[in-house]
Structure formats: C-alpha cells, structure tokens
Amino acid sequence: SLYAPSAMVFSVAQGDDVAAPTVVRATTVSCAPGARGTHPDPKAACAALKSTGGAFDRLLSEPNPDRACPMHYAPVTVSAVGVWEGRRVAWDHTFANSCTMAATLDGNAVF
C-alpha cells in the first residue's frame, strides 16, 4: 500500500484504571487512504489526529477559562489505541471528572 496504516480505537471510560476500564463509549477510525469508521465524524477526527503529528498530548488544550467545573473527583479516562501512520500507539489521559474532560478537550473532534 502507498499509505502507512492508521487505524485507531478511541474510548471514554469511567474511572482511572486503564487496565480494567468501564467503557462509556468507544469508536473506531481508519484514516488512510480515506477517513472511515464508527466515529460520528471520521474526517474531522483524522484531521485532528494529523494535526498532532503523532504527539497525542496535543489533543489536550488549556481548559476553557469561561467554564466552571465542580471540584468533585469522578475520574474519566480517554484512550487511543491502535496504529497511527504505521506506528503502534497506546495513549491515555485521566481527567478529574467529565466536566474537566469536556473543558480540556474543548472543541476536539476525536473524543
């Protein structure tokens, strides 16, 4: 193939135990040669991933300062597992709660 494989599974799970998550939702995306998968907008997800240059921490942004989140701990973990541009990827990030997750992923097309 002329394209390096890019096939990922993205999940949002309750809790902070990556080894045994309680998955709330999961989607798949394959970006080469065309965007497809179970993700609601695979084209936008592929564009967001491509913009990271493979550094998935770049999916995170400074939390929106106009959004106030409660200070309770109900951890939510997002993860990306699969192959991105020919390299195996296993990335995750845990947030204090779903509000903090939404504020930090503000406008992100992946999760």
UniProtKB/Swiss-Prot annotation:
Keyword Disulfide bond in record: yes
Compartments where located: Secreted
Site (Reactive bond) location in chain: 71-72
Recorded GO CC terms: extracellular region
Protein family according to the UniProt entry: Belongs to the protease inhibitor I16 (SSI) family.
HAMAP family: SSI (MF_00778)
Functional description taken from the UniProt entry: Inhibitor of subtilisin and chymotrypsin.
Quaternary structure and interacting proteins, as annotated: Homodimer.
Swiss-Prot/TrEMBL keywords: Disulfide bond, Protease inhibitor, Secreted, Serine protease inhibitor
Protein name: Subtilisin inhibitor-like protein 8
Matches recorded under SUPFAM superfamilies: Subtilisin inhibitor
Gene label: sil8
InterPro entries listed in its UniProt record: Prot_inh_I16_SSI, Prot_inh_SSI_I16_CS, Subtilisin_inhibitor, Subtilisin_inhibitor-like_sf
Keyword Disulfide bond in annotation: yes
Superkingdom in the source lineage: Bacteria
Organism: Streptomyces virginiae
Disulfide bonds: 31-46, 69-99
Entry GO MF terms: serine-type endopeptidase inhibitor activity
